[in-house]
């Protein structure tokens, strides 16, 4: 039996803490591909594609044999070669594609069925993916193809876990942004999971046993969701407070009414009650004569609070707006850069150390540990996006007792939307600067310097999604936020599929040398500066519009003697 929203609210701290842990262990774990790749090769996945070399002796994972490019080597008693790398990288491409592309349909499904069912499905898919990998590892020569299905389910299940956890912060009021940062940070830090599992694997624990236990832990996630997550979605901060336990059926309200609708309806009632005492005044009599009923029936509440749809741009208008198109370019380039590096990192390191598998394994573990930096970087970008917003004036807020304070000179506040655009511009400029720095360090064939590349890669990955989300929230209507974010994820995931041909080009014609691929991606990443440059122009446009509105308000005040523009209900 699913708990109610009130019960879920009482358990919100338990749900939030477990959600952070579950994100770390079960969400985007596929981003720790470098460590998983070593384990898959050590277990013989697609080893049958390799031809046994004549001059390389049998070794282990830590073998220091240095075969030439394209030659086979031994890992834990299994052959390893370029054909195997290409096939496994293709499986990673499929899984990472689903990790991003599934966002749009997930948003549609969650709007219809709520987060509970989606999270149950995601945890079940993750458990099945672990069992499929374990089953494939039992007979790798015959069942290696299962890795494609397993990684697809892994990506889908992981994104279900991430997507549903982002609804939990709605229950924490003023701490909402902090918990969103924690959820995003734990999602981005989940790349540390496979490096941690690799440490257990290197300690001698069977790969199959590890995966079976992991699947069992995913079953615990299923049970936690089953007993604690409600059927209804968690209302946002602007929605009804959980402490309200009064039933409003006597008012004829639907049980799924949102807090925003409730607020508008109750506000309408309050206005009519305040008007009731002066109903006999001339102005109200005119209103009554024009057919505007001021009664308190439930029928009268139904249509008096309709949103101003005319003020909001259409969805297609938002899709073809310059900000969205430039953000798509930025996200596509960034996603391709990050995904290619994760997929090709082992081969890049192998090229730098001339095939020393022990050193490759060490640096792969370092990369995995550094993913925990995302828990720190996610709040940083959140702070940048919220910079000075508390000092701003919200356009939706109506000034109270403005006439009484006309003689007092007040400190002029910033416009909230302009400040949000300014913050987004700074966030994107800083993030893209880090991305360019990452591209430069990748060009330098120095092994210790790659640790700096790991750090920059982690920071950019933790920054970019929060920056895009903050920009969309500032520019577009809230009703379009989910659809636009899902569309952006889908398009950037499709573009990131280019990492497979880039990997094939690096392993084939370029003979394992990533130099020219990195040069091309570095030049491509310069396109990311187009968005902050446009945001500067857009901010100036908003400032001109704000100045025009202020001049209009002064003119209205001069003509009417008051700046309080009221609308009669």
From Swiss-Prot:
What are the glycosylated positions? 55, 58, 560
Ranges where the record places region Disordered: 395-416
A single Gene Ontology MF term assigned here is: L-isoleucine transmembrane transporter activity
In terms of Pfam families, this protein maps to: MFS_1
PTM details? Glycosylated. Dephosphorylation at Ser-274 and phosphorylation at Ser-297 increase affinity and amino acid transport activity. Phosphorylation-dephosphorylation cycle is regulated by food-entrained diurnal rhythm and dietary proteins.
GO biological process terms, alphabetically, are: isoleucine transport; L-leucine transport; methionine transport; phenylalanine transport
Q: Which family does it belong to?
A: Belongs to the SLC43A transporter (TC 2.A.1.44) family.
Q: What does this protein do?
A: Uniporter that mediates the transport of the stereospecific L-phenylalanine, L-methionine and L-branched-chain amino acids, between the extracellular space and the cytoplasm and may control the transepithelial (re)absorption of neutral amino acid in kidney and small intestine. The transport activity is mediated through facilitated diffusion and is sodium ions-, chloride ions- and pH-independent.
User: What protein name does the entry list?
Assistant: Large neutral amino acids transporter small subunit 4
Which species does this protein come from?
Answer: Pongo abelii
Source organism lineage?
Answer: Eukaryota, Metazoa, Chordata, Craniata, Vertebrata
The coding gene here is SLC43A2
């Amino acid at each position: 039996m699913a708990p109610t929203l009130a019960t879920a609210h009482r358990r919100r701290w338990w749900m939030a803490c477990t959600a952070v842990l579950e994100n770390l262990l079960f969400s985007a774990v596929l981003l720790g591909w470098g460590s998983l790749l070593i384990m898959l090769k050590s277990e013989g996945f697609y080893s049958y594609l390799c031809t046994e070399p004549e001059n390389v002796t049998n070794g282990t994972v830590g073998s220091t044999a240095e075969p030439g490019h394209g030659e086979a080597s031994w890992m834990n008693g299994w052959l390893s070669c370029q054909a195997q790398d290409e096939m496994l990288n293709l499986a990673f491409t499929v899984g990472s594609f689903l990790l991003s592309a599934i966002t749009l349909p997930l948003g549609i499904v969650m709007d219809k069925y709520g987060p509970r069912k989606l999270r149950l499905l995601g945890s079940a898919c993750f458990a099945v993916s672990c069992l499929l990998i374990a089953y494939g590892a039992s007979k790798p020569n015959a069942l290696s193809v299962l890795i494609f299905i397993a990684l697809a389910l892994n990506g889908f299940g992981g994104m279900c876990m991430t997507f549903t956890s982002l609804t939990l912060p709605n229950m924490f009021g003023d701490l909402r942004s902090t918990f969103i940062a924690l959820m995003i940070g734990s999602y981005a830090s989940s790349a540390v999971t496979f490096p941690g599992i690799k440490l257990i694997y290197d300690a001698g624990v069977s790969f199959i046993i590890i995966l079976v236990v992991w699947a069992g832990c995913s079953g615990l996630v299923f049970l936690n969701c089953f007993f604690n997550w409600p059927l209804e979605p968690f209302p946002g901060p602007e929605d009804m407070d959980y402490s309200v336990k009064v039933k409003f059926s006597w008012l004829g309200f639907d049980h799924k009414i949102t807090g925003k609708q409730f607020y508008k309806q109750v506000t309408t009632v309050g206005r009519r009650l305040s008007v009731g005492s002066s109903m006999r005044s001339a102005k109200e009599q005119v209103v009554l004569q024009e057919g505007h009923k001021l009664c308190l029936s439930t029928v009268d509440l139904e249509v008096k609070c309709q949103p101003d749809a005319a003020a909001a741009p259409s969805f297609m208008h938002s899709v073809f707006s310059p900000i969205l198109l430039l953000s798509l370019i930025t996200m596509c380039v960034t996603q391709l850069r990050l995904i290619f590096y994760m997929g090709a990192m082992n081969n890049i390191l192998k090229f730098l150390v001339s095939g020393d598998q022990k050193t490759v394994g060490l640096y792969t573990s370092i990369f995995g540990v550094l993913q925990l930096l995302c828990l720190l970087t996610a709040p940083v970008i959140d702070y940048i996006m919220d910079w000075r917003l508390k000092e701003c004036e919200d356009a939706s807020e109506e000034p109270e007792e403005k006439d009484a304070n006309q003689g007092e000179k007040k400190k002029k506040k910033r416009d909230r939307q302009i400040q949000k655009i300014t913050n987004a511009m700074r966030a994107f400029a800083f993030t893209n600067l880090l991305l360019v720095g990452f591209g430069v360090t990748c060009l330098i064939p120095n092994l210790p310097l790659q640790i700096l590349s790991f750090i920059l890669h982690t920071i950019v990955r933790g920054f970019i999604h929060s920056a895009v989300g903050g920009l969309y929230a500032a520019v577009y209507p809230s009703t379009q936020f989910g659809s636009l974010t899902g569309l952006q994820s889908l398009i950037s995931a499709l573009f990131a599929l280019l990492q497979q041909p880039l990997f094939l080009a690096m392993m084939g014609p370029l003979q394992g040398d990533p130099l020219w691929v990195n040069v091309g991606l570095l030049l491509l990443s310069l396109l990311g500066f187009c968005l902050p440059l446009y945001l500067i122009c857009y901010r100036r446009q908003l400032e001109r519009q704000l100045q025009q509105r202020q001049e209009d308000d002064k003119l209205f005040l001069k003509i009417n003697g008051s700046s309080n523009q009221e609308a009669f209900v």
